[in-house]
Amino acid sequence: MIALIQRVKRADVRVGDRTTGEIGAGLLALVCAERGDTDAAADKLLAKMLGYRVFSDAAGKMNLPVSNIDGEGRAGGLLLVSQFTLAADTNSGLRPSFTPAAPPDEGARLFDYFVAAARARHPVVETGEFGADMQVSLVNDGPVTFWLQVRP
């Protein structure tokens, strides 16, 4: 399972004229399930994402996780957006292959599982809409961007 996480000042996702998710300071995570991924892989990726220290402490060092973005216990937002293109195979030709991505039904199930697990462990979780054509807006903070990947 893959997540491309970006530290943001704010972010939102829209489907048509409707805002489906919006956060202030926190993490925007583009999330992708790959073929063969399991609930255990989703749990492992979520634990890594929630514990990843990408927010600055009082000394300016990236040392704080999204659960404590100010060093005083304030949790940042988590905006989860499904994006199967992260699994693209780009090794040959000029057209990406999406064979490595989980099939849509399994991708949707794993994304829903990931969102439910995140909501159980973090106070501020917003989402996009699986399979929809979404418009994602964000203000990067840094920019600070990391590719997180776990194998089943």
UniProtKB/Swiss-Prot annotation:
An aminoacyl-tRNA editing enzyme that deacylates mischarged D-aminoacyl-tRNAs. Also deacylates mischarged glycyl-tRNA(Ala), protecting cells against glycine mischarging by AlaRS. Acts via tRNA-based rather than protein-based catalysis; rejects L-amino acids rather than detecting D-amino acids in the active site. By recycling D-aminoacyl-tRNA to D-amino acids and free tRNA molecules, this enzyme counteracts the toxicity associated with the formation of D-aminoacyl-tRNA entities in vivo and helps enforce protein L-homochirality. Keywords: Cytoplasm, Hydrolase, RNA-binding, tRNA-binding. Belongs to the DTD family. Its EC number is 3.1.1.96. The keyword RNA-binding applies. It catalyses: glycyl-tRNA(Ala) + H2O = tRNA(Ala) + glycine + H(+); a D-aminoacyl-tRNA + H2O = a tRNA + a D-alpha-amino acid + H(+). Its main location: cytoplasm. This is D-aminoacyl-tRNA deacylase. One of its GO terms (molecular function) is Ser(Gly)-tRNA(Ala) hydrolase activity. A Gly-cisPro motif from one monomer fits into the active site of the other monomer to allow specific chiral rejection of L-amino acids.
